[in-house]
Protein backbone atom coordinates (compact mmCIF):
# COMPACT_ATOMS: atom_id res chain seq x y z
CA UNK A 1 0.00 0.00 0.00
CA UNK A 2 1.50 3.33 -1.08
CA UNK A 3 1.10 6.30 1.24
CA UNK A 4 0.49 9.82 -0.02
CA UNK A 5 0.37 13.24 1.60
CA UNK A 6 -0.07 16.86 0.54
CA UNK A 7 3.04 19.03 0.59
CA UNK A 8 1.63 22.18 2.16
CA UNK A 9 4.21 24.49 0.60
CA UNK A 10 3.49 23.43 -2.99
CA UNK A 11 0.05 21.82 -2.75
CA UNK A 12 1.47 18.76 -4.50
CA UNK A 13 0.43 15.20 -3.71
CA UNK A 14 3.57 13.23 -2.85
CA UNK A 15 4.39 9.62 -2.08
CA UNK A 16 5.88 8.95 1.34
CA UNK A 17 9.14 7.04 1.62
CA UNK A 18 8.25 4.42 4.24
CA UNK A 19 11.07 3.09 6.40
CA UNK A 20 10.67 -0.66 6.90
CA UNK A 21 7.81 -0.88 4.41
CA UNK A 22 8.21 -4.61 3.75
CA UNK A 23 8.46 -5.34 7.46
CA UNK A 24 5.26 -3.38 8.21
CA UNK A 25 3.31 -5.12 5.44
CA UNK A 26 4.43 -8.53 6.70
CA UNK A 27 3.84 -7.72 10.38
CA UNK A 28 0.37 -6.23 9.94
CA UNK A 29 -0.77 -8.01 6.79
CA UNK A 30 0.05 -11.71 7.29
CA UNK A 31 -0.89 -14.35 9.85
CA UNK A 32 2.73 -15.18 10.66
CA UNK A 33 3.67 -11.51 11.00
CA UNK A 34 0.68 -10.82 13.21
CA UNK A 35 1.67 -13.67 15.51
CA UNK A 36 5.13 -12.15 15.98
CA UNK A 37 3.52 -8.73 16.49
CA UNK A 38 1.28 -9.94 19.32
CA UNK A 39 3.89 -12.19 20.95
CA UNK A 40 6.93 -9.91 20.76
CA UNK A 41 6.91 -6.70 18.70
CA UNK A 42 4.15 -4.86 20.57
CA UNK A 43 5.79 -5.52 23.95
CA UNK A 44 7.78 -2.96 25.92
CA UNK A 45 10.80 -5.27 26.18
CA UNK A 46 11.18 -5.41 22.38
CA UNK A 47 11.20 -1.63 21.95
CA UNK A 48 13.39 -1.16 25.04
CA UNK A 49 16.06 -3.57 23.79
CA UNK A 50 15.93 -2.12 20.28
CA UNK A 51 16.18 1.38 21.72
CA UNK A 52 19.26 0.48 23.76
CA UNK A 53 20.94 -0.86 20.64
CA UNK A 54 20.51 2.57 19.05
CA UNK A 55 22.50 4.04 21.96
CA UNK A 56 25.57 1.92 21.18
CA UNK A 57 28.53 3.37 19.30
CA UNK A 58 28.22 0.66 16.63
CA UNK A 59 24.76 1.99 15.67
CA UNK A 60 26.49 5.08 14.26
CA UNK A 61 27.30 3.10 11.12
CA UNK A 62 23.64 3.22 10.04
CA UNK A 63 23.37 7.00 9.97
CA UNK A 64 24.71 7.78 6.49
CA UNK A 65 22.63 5.07 4.82
CA UNK A 66 19.52 6.19 6.71
CA UNK A 67 20.03 9.79 5.54
CA UNK A 68 20.43 8.69 1.93
CA UNK A 69 17.51 6.22 1.84
CA UNK A 70 15.03 8.60 3.48
CA UNK A 71 16.36 11.72 1.73
CA UNK A 72 16.91 13.69 4.93
CA UNK A 73 18.03 17.31 4.49
CA UNK A 74 21.02 17.62 6.83
CA UNK A 75 21.45 21.31 5.95
CA UNK A 76 18.65 21.93 8.49
CA UNK A 77 20.56 20.31 11.35
CA UNK A 78 22.89 22.02 13.80
CA UNK A 79 25.37 19.18 13.24
CA UNK A 80 25.34 18.51 9.51
CA UNK A 81 28.12 15.91 9.37
CA UNK A 82 26.97 12.35 10.30
CA UNK A 83 30.36 11.78 11.93
CA UNK A 84 29.49 14.35 14.60
CA UNK A 85 26.89 12.05 16.18
CA UNK A 86 27.97 9.55 18.83
CA UNK A 87 25.25 6.97 18.03
CA UNK A 88 22.04 6.53 16.05
CA UNK A 89 19.73 7.89 18.77
CA UNK A 90 21.91 10.98 19.04
CA UNK A 91 21.31 11.53 15.32
CA UNK A 92 17.63 10.59 15.46
CA UNK A 93 16.89 13.22 18.13
CA UNK A 94 19.06 15.79 16.34
CA UNK A 95 18.47 19.47 16.93
CA UNK A 96 17.88 21.89 14.05
CA UNK A 97 19.19 25.36 13.34
CA UNK A 98 16.70 28.01 14.49
CA UNK A 99 16.39 29.43 10.99
CA UNK A 100 15.29 25.99 9.75
CA UNK A 101 12.06 26.25 11.76
CA UNK A 102 10.99 29.89 12.16
CA UNK A 103 8.30 30.38 14.80
CA UNK A 104 5.18 32.33 13.85
CA UNK A 105 5.09 35.06 16.53
CA UNK A 106 1.50 36.28 16.03
CA UNK A 107 -0.24 35.51 19.38
CA UNK A 108 -3.48 34.71 17.57
CA UNK A 109 -1.83 31.90 15.57
CA UNK A 110 -1.54 28.34 16.89
CA UNK A 111 1.65 26.69 15.65
CA UNK A 112 2.40 23.07 14.87
CA UNK A 113 4.30 21.50 17.78
CA UNK A 114 6.14 19.06 15.51
CA UNK A 115 7.12 18.12 11.99
CA UNK A 116 4.80 15.50 10.54
CA UNK A 117 1.72 14.60 8.60
CA UNK A 118 -1.48 15.94 10.11
CA UNK A 119 -5.13 14.97 10.23
CA UNK A 120 -7.36 17.70 11.74
CA UNK A 121 -10.87 17.22 13.14
CA UNK A 122 -13.41 19.81 14.31
CA UNK A 123 -16.49 19.32 16.50
CA UNK A 124 -15.28 15.94 17.77
CA UNK A 125 -17.65 13.50 19.47
CA UNK A 126 -15.98 12.32 22.69
CA UNK A 127 -17.33 8.83 22.05
CA UNK A 128 -16.34 8.61 18.37
CA UNK A 129 -12.99 10.29 17.73
CA UNK A 130 -11.61 9.24 14.34
CA UNK A 131 -8.46 7.09 14.21
CA UNK A 132 -8.75 6.42 10.48
CA UNK A 133 -11.77 6.19 8.19
CA UNK A 134 -14.16 3.64 9.70
CA UNK A 135 -12.31 3.32 13.02
CA UNK A 136 -12.93 5.40 16.15
CA UNK A 137 -12.05 5.55 19.85
CA UNK A 138 -13.40 7.21 23.00
CA UNK A 139 -11.67 10.12 24.70
CA UNK A 140 -12.28 8.61 28.13
CA UNK A 141 -10.29 5.54 27.05
CA UNK A 142 -7.50 7.70 25.66
CA UNK A 143 -7.26 10.08 28.64
CA UNK A 144 -8.31 7.53 31.28
CA UNK A 145 -10.17 10.45 32.83
CA UNK A 146 -13.92 10.81 32.21
CA UNK A 147 -14.17 14.40 33.46
CA UNK A 148 -11.32 15.56 31.21
CA UNK A 149 -12.87 13.76 28.24
CA UNK A 150 -16.16 15.63 28.70
CA UNK A 151 -14.32 18.97 28.69
CA UNK A 152 -13.10 18.33 25.14
CA UNK A 153 -16.37 17.04 23.68
CA UNK A 154 -17.15 19.18 20.62
CA UNK A 155 -13.60 20.50 20.47
CA UNK A 156 -10.68 20.07 18.09
CA UNK A 157 -8.29 17.15 17.62
CA UNK A 158 -5.09 17.35 15.58
CA UNK A 159 -3.05 14.18 15.01
CA UNK A 160 0.53 14.77 13.83
CA UNK A 161 2.25 11.58 12.69
CA UNK A 162 6.03 11.62 12.69
CA UNK A 163 7.76 9.13 10.40
CA UNK A 164 11.39 8.06 10.99
CA UNK A 165 12.73 10.64 8.50
CA UNK A 166 11.23 13.56 10.42
CA UNK A 167 12.67 15.91 13.03
CA UNK A 168 11.77 14.15 16.29
CA UNK A 169 11.68 16.93 18.85
CA UNK A 170 8.30 18.35 19.87
CA UNK A 171 7.54 21.88 21.04
CA UNK A 172 4.85 24.01 22.67
CA UNK A 173 2.16 25.33 20.26
CA UNK A 174 1.72 28.49 22.37
CA UNK A 175 3.22 30.09 25.45
CA UNK A 176 1.89 28.98 28.81
CA UNK A 177 2.37 26.54 31.70
CA UNK A 178 2.14 22.75 31.91
CA UNK A 179 0.11 21.88 35.00
CA UNK A 180 1.01 18.19 34.98
CA UNK A 181 2.04 15.27 32.78
CA UNK A 182 0.58 11.80 33.23
CA UNK A 183 2.35 8.71 31.91
CA UNK A 184 0.20 5.80 30.77
CA UNK A 185 1.88 2.48 30.07
CA UNK A 186 0.74 0.42 27.11
CA UNK A 187 1.69 -1.45 23.98
CA UNK A 188 4.08 -0.38 21.22
CA UNK A 189 2.11 -0.88 18.01
CA UNK A 190 3.29 1.02 14.94
CA UNK A 191 1.40 4.27 14.24
CA UNK A 192 1.97 3.97 10.48
CA UNK A 193 -1.32 4.10 8.48
CA UNK A 194 -0.82 0.42 7.61
CA UNK A 195 -1.12 -0.42 11.31
CA UNK A 196 -3.84 2.16 12.04
CA UNK A 197 -6.14 0.42 9.56
CA UNK A 198 -5.51 -3.01 11.07
CA UNK A 199 -5.45 -2.40 14.84
CA UNK A 200 -8.44 -0.79 16.57
CA UNK A 201 -7.90 2.01 19.08
CA UNK A 202 -4.10 2.06 18.77
CA UNK A 203 -3.75 5.41 20.54
CA UNK A 204 -5.73 4.04 23.50
CA UNK A 205 -3.61 0.89 23.60
CA UNK A 206 -0.12 2.37 23.14
CA UNK A 207 2.17 3.94 25.71
CA UNK A 208 1.49 7.68 25.91
CA UNK A 209 2.15 10.79 27.95
CA UNK A 210 -0.60 13.36 28.51
CA UNK A 211 0.17 16.96 29.50
CA UNK A 212 -2.47 19.43 30.65
CA UNK A 213 -1.27 22.75 29.22
CA UNK A 214 -2.69 26.15 30.18
CA UNK A 215 -1.88 28.23 27.11
CA UNK A 216 -1.72 32.01 26.98
CA UNK A 217 -4.06 32.47 24.01
CA UNK A 218 -6.08 29.28 23.42
CA UNK A 219 -7.14 28.24 26.91
CA UNK A 220 -6.44 24.84 28.36
CA UNK A 221 -5.32 22.16 25.92
CA UNK A 222 -4.13 18.57 26.06
CA UNK A 223 -0.74 17.77 24.54
CA UNK A 224 -0.11 14.07 24.02
CA UNK A 225 2.87 12.06 22.83
CA UNK A 226 2.23 8.48 21.74
CA UNK A 227 4.97 5.85 21.61
CA UNK A 228 5.24 3.19 18.90
CA UNK A 229 7.23 0.13 17.83
CA UNK A 230 10.96 0.63 18.44
CA UNK A 231 10.49 4.03 20.10
CA UNK A 232 13.13 3.71 22.83
CA UNK A 233 11.48 6.33 25.01
CA UNK A 234 9.61 9.62 25.22
CA UNK A 235 11.86 12.20 26.89
CA UNK A 236 10.33 15.36 28.40
CA UNK A 237 12.81 18.26 28.66
CA UNK A 238 10.58 21.01 30.11
CA UNK A 239 10.06 21.76 33.82
CA UNK A 240 6.55 21.22 35.15
CA UNK A 241 4.88 24.37 36.48
CA UNK A 242 7.38 26.69 34.77
CA UNK A 243 6.27 29.22 32.15
CA UNK A 244 7.31 28.37 28.58
CA UNK A 245 7.42 30.38 25.38
CA UNK A 246 5.70 29.57 22.12
CA UNK A 247 7.89 27.18 20.13
CA UNK A 248 10.04 26.23 23.13
CA UNK A 249 11.11 22.58 23.19
CA UNK A 250 8.91 20.22 25.23
CA UNK A 251 10.79 16.96 24.60
CA UNK A 252 11.86 14.38 22.05
CA UNK A 253 11.38 10.81 20.89
CA UNK A 254 14.19 8.31 20.63
CA UNK A 255 14.22 6.01 17.60
CA UNK A 256 10.97 5.06 15.87
CA UNK A 257 7.91 6.54 14.23
CA UNK A 258 5.61 8.30 16.68
CA UNK A 259 2.66 10.68 17.08
CA UNK A 260 1.83 13.98 18.75
CA UNK A 261 -1.87 14.75 19.38
CA UNK A 262 -3.40 18.12 20.34
CA UNK A 263 -6.85 18.59 21.83
CA UNK A 264 -8.39 22.05 22.19
CA UNK A 265 -11.76 22.95 23.66
CA UNK A 266 -14.80 23.95 21.65
CA UNK A 267 -14.45 27.46 20.23
CA UNK A 268 -10.78 27.88 21.21
CA UNK A 269 -9.35 27.84 17.68
CA UNK A 270 -10.29 27.79 14.01
CA UNK A 271 -8.16 25.22 12.25
CA UNK A 272 -6.75 26.26 8.85
CA UNK A 273 -9.15 25.20 6.11
CA UNK A 274 -6.59 23.39 3.98
CA UNK A 275 -5.90 20.98 6.85
CA UNK A 276 -9.60 20.32 7.37
CA UNK A 277 -10.32 19.91 3.66
CA UNK A 278 -7.44 17.48 3.13
CA UNK A 279 -8.55 15.48 6.17
CA UNK A 280 -12.06 15.24 4.71
CA UNK A 281 -10.42 13.75 1.59
CA UNK A 282 -8.61 11.25 3.86
CA UNK A 283 -5.15 12.56 3.01
CA UNK A 284 -2.58 13.92 5.46
CA UNK A 285 -0.89 17.33 5.10
CA UNK A 286 2.83 17.73 5.76
CA UNK A 287 3.49 20.47 8.31
CA UNK A 288 6.62 21.78 10.02
CA UNK A 289 7.13 22.79 13.61
CA UNK A 290 6.56 26.52 14.05
CA UNK A 291 4.19 27.12 11.13
CA UNK A 292 0.62 28.23 11.71
CA UNK A 293 -2.10 25.55 11.79
CA UNK A 294 -4.99 27.58 13.21
CA UNK A 295 -5.97 30.91 14.73
CA UNK A 296 -8.32 32.49 17.23
UniProtKB/Swiss-Prot annotation:
Q: In which pathway does it act?
A: Phospholipid metabolism; phosphatidylethanolamine biosynthesis; phosphatidylethanolamine from CDP-diacylglycerol: step 2/2
Q: Where in the cell is it found?
A: Cell membrane
**Any GO CC annotation of this UniProt entry:** plasma membrane
- Residues annotated with Pyruvic acid (Ser) modification: 258
Site described as Cleavage (non-hydrolytic), located at 257-258
Q: Which UniProt keywords apply?
A: Cell membrane, Decarboxylase, Lipid biosynthesis, Lipid metabolism, Lyase, Membrane, Phospholipid biosynthesis, Phospholipid metabolism, Pyruvate, Zymogen
Q: What is its main location?
A: membrane
Task: Check the record and name the InterPro entries matching this protein.
Answer: PS_Dcarbxylase (IPR003817), PSD-B (IPR033177), PSD_type2_pro (IPR033179)
Q: How does it sit in the membrane?
A: Peripheral membrane protein
The catalysed reaction is: a 1,2-diacyl-sn-glycero-3-phospho-L-serine + H(+) = a 1,2-diacyl-sn-glycero-3-phosphoethanolamine + CO2
- Gene Ontology MF terms in the entry: phosphatidylserine decarboxylase activity
Q: How is the cofactor bound?
A: Binds 1 pyruvoyl group covalently per subunit.
User: What top-tier enzyme class does this entry carry?
Assistant: lyase
Q: Which cofactor does it need?
A: pyruvate
**What domain of life does the native source organism fall in?**
Bacteria
**In the UniProt entry, which residues are flagged as the active site?**
115, 171, 258
Family to which the UniProt record says this protein belongs: Belongs to the phosphatidylserine decarboxylase family. PSD-B subfamily. Prokaryotic type II sub-subfamily.
Outline what the protein does: Catalyzes the formation of phosphatidylethanolamine (PtdEtn) from phosphatidylserine (PtdSer).
Quaternary structure and partners: Heterodimer of a large membrane-associated beta subunit and a small pyruvoyl-containing alpha subunit.
Q: Which PANTHER family match?
A: PHOSPHATIDYLSERINE DECARBOXYLASE (PTHR10067), PHOSPHATIDYLSERINE DECARBOXYLASE PROENZYME 2 (PTHR10067:SF17)
Report the protein name in the record.
Phosphatidylserine decarboxylase proenzyme
